[in-house]
């Protein structure tokens, strides 16, 4: 008999979890509290149901070739970066293509998920749900929690003295949909993540003035890289990842700063990272121009509010503020879980490889999608789901809970003593994390073997963008179309741009430029790697670089 799996949520994580269950001959039942799939990608004009929804103007930050399910590429005529409606259409196409909708119970809320009395032997769960006021109870062999990390808005009013006496409008960006209601206003946006940048830019078109407050600053990246290619495809490459493992961290920071400041000097624009803070970046094509034109003014963090104004940490005061929009992120929660499991899952370090709670006697629960990646979360959740379903089926193993808890407890103690840094809330490096999960499944690409068997494919895998199709080339879940998808990924990237016929001379020039842009840097880096293959040589170079560069970094 097939094992029964409860999937909580039908967003990007839930949909791939349903499919992965079917791929492993498991029996999924998905519970979705709204009336449709897509989670936050399903746009609605209001958020009265308490669910997080996106704003109307949202555009994806990761290009289509880097943010698709690994065996279901976007249609070639889809734009590289798309509107929320286009992305939701893709999710609908995915669900229909793999016939996933029949496994979803809509307008159903999960009330509780508790261990069965014989959990230590069976790993089973009691799941109580509610549909139209009626409760139902069922037993499942495993549970996949796919509610994501955008559940509850984080509104830290207690951190802003005087905010309660402020007379203007106060809201979280979860409630923001369109800019029209702010026409002619002076608006203060607090927080500079991707949402903060987007909201500030959009408001600048109708508001009298937009003030953008940030504590730490940020690097601002454009969606188009050198030559106009999607930046994700240019920077997310295995060859570059190898180089990052070799070069000293101080040298990498220096290179990154130079690269980031090529487009514009972040310090001049008030965006440079506060000294001692972890570097972060946002994707925004228009923010620098808005700052340059004066429609957006960057400010330091807010010290306190009065009835009509905001006083900032640098002593400046902005009067007559009409609205304050907090873009301060979200707090994830698992209200349906029992204690102490609920509290443990709230600490990411207690999730083995960000998926399995460390304290469970049986690995029959997986938290899917609770990750921050320097890349597409969708592709990360798919690999998590592929791994989790194979663990449920007994095809993959994880260490016993005693070992996992001992390791985490030791790490927690070292963090408290200041011996090591807590990195559980930092964004994970994309390729290392994806490869780690793929190795657990048995789908990590074998680059040396590929160079022997299929040099053309190996070249694209190692020097080209690390697209999700790479994790379908071999092992469990192998997809026959993966090779072709990789070799044609640049064709699908350029297809939506080819809307005007150009002369043959221009085409040849563009083609040459394309190959120089795409392969020039990887070839140069490959040459460096070949020269530096001796570990002794690497050590000496690293020491010399450290000694020569460090004094300049200090200055």
UniProtKB/Swiss-Prot annotation:
Cofactor(s) it depends on: FAD
Gene that encodes it: FMO4
Enzyme class of the recorded protein, top EC level: oxidoreductase
Identification of the protein by name: Dimethylaniline monooxygenase [N-oxide-forming] 4
Source species of the chain: Oryctolagus cuniculus
Family, per entry: Belongs to the FMO family.
GO MF term set: flavin adenine dinucleotide binding; N,N-dimethylaniline monooxygenase activity; NADP binding
Entry keyword Endoplasmic reticulum: yes
Chief subcellular location: membrane
Annotated positions binding NADP(+): 60-61, 195-198
A cellular component term, taken from the record's GO annotations: endoplasmic reticulum membrane
Chain residues that bind FAD: 9-13, 32, 40-41
Localization annotation: Microsome membrane; Endoplasmic reticulum membrane
EC number(s) stated in the UniProt entry for this protein: 1.14.13.8
Membrane topology: Single-pass membrane protein
Reaction(s) catalysed by this chain's protein: N,N-dimethylaniline + NADPH + O2 + H(+) = N,N-dimethylaniline N-oxide + NADP(+) + H2O
Tissue expression summary: Kidney and liver.
Job of this protein: This protein is involved in the oxidative metabolism of a variety of xenobiotics such as drugs and pesticides.
PANTHER family noted in UniProt: DIMETHYLANILINE MONOOXYGENASE
Residue intervals passing through the bilayer: 515-532
Domain of life per record: Eukaryota
Assigned keywords, A-Z: Endoplasmic reticulum, FAD, Flavoprotein, Membrane, Microsome, Monooxygenase, NADP, Oxidoreductase, Transmembrane, Transmembrane helix
């Amino acid at each position: 008999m097939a094992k029964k799996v409860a999937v909580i949520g039908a967003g990007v994580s839930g949909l791939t979890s349903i499919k992965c269950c079917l791929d492993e001959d498991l029996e999924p039942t998905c519970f979705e509290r709204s009336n449709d799939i897509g989670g936050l990608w399903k746009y609605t004009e209001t958020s009265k149901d308490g669910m997080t929804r996106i704003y109307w103007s949202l555009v994806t930050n990761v290009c289509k070739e880097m943010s698709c399910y690994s065996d279901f590429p976007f249609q070639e005529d889809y734009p590289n970066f798309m509107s929320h409606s286009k992305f939701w259409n893709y999710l609908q196409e995915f669900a229909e293509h793999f016939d996933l909708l029949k496994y979803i119970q809509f307008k159903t809320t999960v009330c509780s998920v508790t261990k069965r009395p014989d959990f230590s032997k069976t790993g089973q769960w009691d799941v109580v749900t509610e549909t139209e006021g009626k409760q139902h109870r069922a037993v499942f062999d495993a549970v996949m929690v796919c509610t994501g990390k955008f559940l509850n808005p984080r509104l830290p009013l207690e951190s802003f003295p005087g905010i309660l006496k402020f007379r203007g409008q106060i809201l979280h960006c979860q409630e923001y949909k369109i800019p029209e209601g702010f026409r002619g206003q002076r608006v203060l946006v607090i927080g500079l993540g991707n949402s903060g940048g987007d909201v500030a830019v959009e408001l600048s078109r109708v508001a009298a003035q937009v003030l953008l407050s940030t504590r730490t600053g940020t690097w601002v990246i454009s969606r188009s890289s050198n030559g106009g290619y999607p930046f994700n495809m240019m920077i997310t490459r295995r060859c570059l990842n190898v180089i990052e493992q070799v070069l000293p961290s101080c040298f990498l920071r220096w290179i990154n700063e130079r690269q980031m400041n090529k487009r514009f000097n972040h310090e001049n624009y008030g965006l440079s990272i506060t000294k001692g803070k972890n570097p972060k970046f946002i994707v925004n094509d228009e923010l620098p121009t808005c700052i340059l034109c004066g429609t957006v003014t960057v400010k330091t963090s807010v010290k306190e509010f009065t009835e009509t104004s905001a006083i900032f940490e640098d002593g400046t005061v902005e009067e007559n503020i009409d609205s304050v929009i907090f873009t301060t992120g979200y707090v994830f929660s698992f209200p349906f879980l029992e204690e102490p499991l609920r509290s443990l899952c709230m600490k990411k370090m207690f999730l083995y490889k960000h998926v399995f709670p460390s304290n469970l006697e049986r690995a029959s629960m997986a938290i899917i999608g609770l990750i921050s990646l320097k890349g597409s979360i969708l592709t990360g959740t798919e690999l998590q789901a592929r791994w989790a379903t194979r663990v449920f089926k007994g095809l993959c193993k994880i260490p016993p809970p005693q070992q996992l808890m001992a390791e985490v407890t030791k790490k927690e103690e070292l963090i408290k003593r200041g011996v090591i840094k807590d990195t559980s809330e930092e964004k994970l490096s994309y390729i290392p994390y994806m490869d780690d999960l793929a190795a657990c499944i048995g789908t990590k690409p074998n680059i040396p073997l590929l160079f022997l068997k299929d040099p053309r494919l190996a070249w694209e895998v190692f020097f080209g963008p690390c697209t999700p199709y790479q994790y379908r080339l071999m092992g469990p879940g192998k997809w026959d179309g993966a090779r072709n998808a990789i070799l044609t990924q640049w064709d699908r990237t350029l297809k939506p741009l080819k809307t005007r016929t150009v002369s043959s001379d221009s085409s040849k020039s563009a083609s040459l430029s394309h190959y120089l842009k795409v392969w020039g840097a990887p070839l140069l880096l490959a040459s460096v790697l070949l020269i530096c293959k001796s570990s002794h040589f690497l050590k000496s170079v690293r020491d010399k670089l450290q000694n020569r560069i460090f004094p300049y970094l200090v200055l």
